[in-house]
């Protein structure tokens, strides 16, 4: 079995890349230090990276990898950079002004303009059609991008790069064109994550490993019309996420369940925990149905076992073997005391999840505590919250804030310190205003903190995405809370995932057309088999919304 070498500087989720390469029939050998790096014994090298530019390139240099990487490139053997692995080829980035890259490409990365679109870019974009695409990049396929900083192009920069021998695959986010992939001689790199881009991404990895550039398939005019990017949503497809609430039932089995206003027990039948299936099998099923992401919310956090034996780690490891789209895990991402009394910081907990196959971690209760502290300190963090420590190491895009709010009616802004708005749906006593109160501990405890205040604080502390639940809508199958979504979109510039209330495909369309939701999440309607993820996507496609279709 041919061997692929992967440089490991402990930057994010290498498990998924390893799984993708093994899925393609290759063996993976991780290169953890320069002394493990034998150029003559290496035929394919991959440099993956996630998170903060400076954190990654400084790590690369401090561990002594610069010289062997340069010698390997000089040898003419194939190398592939992924995400920050692509960015490391550049001179530097405004994200980390004091850090220097490998400087194979002489210009600096810059941040996307967030005045016109959410930043980070999180979602499925495409390469702009060109005659010079390479390694099977297909302008009618979608690839998974997750980044705030990019090699943003203008005509002069593009011309200079091409004059220097670089082939460029461009993508466009909002009005900004940037480098999606580059190729020169033996160097190939992608800004997107091919290991998280479904079958389309696996094809790109396979083409690199086989050093082949097959032609773009012959699509019919009708197929091109359906699949081509119309840039109606900044260039991204409408993202559909399948969510699995995981907990142990009364028999000790790990099951996927679903609440009704956060109550996961049956109304009859002895009040047992609703069992809607096994998490790994369901995740695989939703991936096959076309889910753009799968989220595991570990709703009991498995408090009675050592962290390293947490069942969720095994769930992630198994799911990541066959689910080649992003995986998010939530529950228990905080500073903990292990069963043996050892104190384990949130960053270490998150790192364990990332190494097991997670791409993002979701923080709930501790995000509320962090936001309260942020305001107590006069609108600043102190660097110790899980949001700050994890985003500093892995990047904002790795930190999702899971919010569990409920609607509170008031007569005017004077009734609360939290931001209110005038609602179309007056309260039981004719109240015209409302705010959304944050809860903790799975909705069991309310705090004097509004969703507006929470999300703004978390964005400032370094979070990259909001998973916006709604206790009032949970399990209702009556559609998302559209007012809540718009309220939070007014508050922050990071992407917002609409959650709670979806019962039919029309609810997804309604959220995408009537709000600025960046993604929509479904749970019960998928678990019960009433609709598949593909049913939702087909419906959206029929109604003129672009979605990712990942068929061979």
UniProtKB/Swiss-Prot annotation:
Region annotation (PRFAR binding) ranges: 364-365, 402-404, 474-475, 500-501, 523-524
Residues the entry annotates as binding substrate: 332, 469
One annotated GO biological process: L-histidine biosynthetic process
UniProt catalytic activity: 5-[(5-phospho-1-deoxy-D-ribulos-1-ylimino)methylamino]-1-(5-phospho-beta-D-ribosyl)imidazole-4-carboxamide + L-glutamine = D-erythro-1-(imidazol-4-yl)glycerol 3-phosphate + 5-amino-1-(5-phospho-beta-D-ribosyl)imidazole-4-carboxamide + L-glutamate + H(+); L-glutamine + H2O = L-glutamate + NH4(+)
Biological or metabolic pathway of the protein: Amino-acid biosynthesis; L-histidine biosynthesis; L-histidine from 5-phospho-alpha-D-ribose 1-diphosphate: step 5/9
Keywords on record: Amino-acid biosynthesis, Glutamine amidotransferase, Histidine biosynthesis, Hydrolase, Lyase, Multifunctional enzyme, Stress response
InterPro entries found in the cross-reference section: Aldolase_TIM (IPR013785), Class_I_gatase-like (IPR029062), GATASE (IPR017926), His_biosynth (IPR006062), HisF (IPR004651), IGPS_HisA/HisF (IPR050064), IGPS_HisHF (IPR014640), Imidazole-glycPsynth_HisH (IPR010139)
Induction: By amino acid starvation. It has a GCN4-dependent and a GCN4-independent (basal) expression.
CDD domains documented for this protein: GATase1_IGP_Synthase, HisF
Domain of life of the source: Eukaryota
Quaternary state and interactors: Monomer.
Family per record: In the C-terminal section; belongs to the HisA/HisF family.
Function: IGPS catalyzes the conversion of PRFAR and glutamine to IGP, AICAR and glutamate. The glutaminase domain produces the ammonia necessary for the cyclase domain to produce IGP and AICAR from PRFAR. The ammonia is channeled to the active site of the cyclase domain.
Name the UniProt record assigns to this protein: Imidazole glycerol phosphate synthase hisHF
Organism: Saccharomyces cerevisiae (strain ATCC 204508 / S288c) (Baker's yeast)
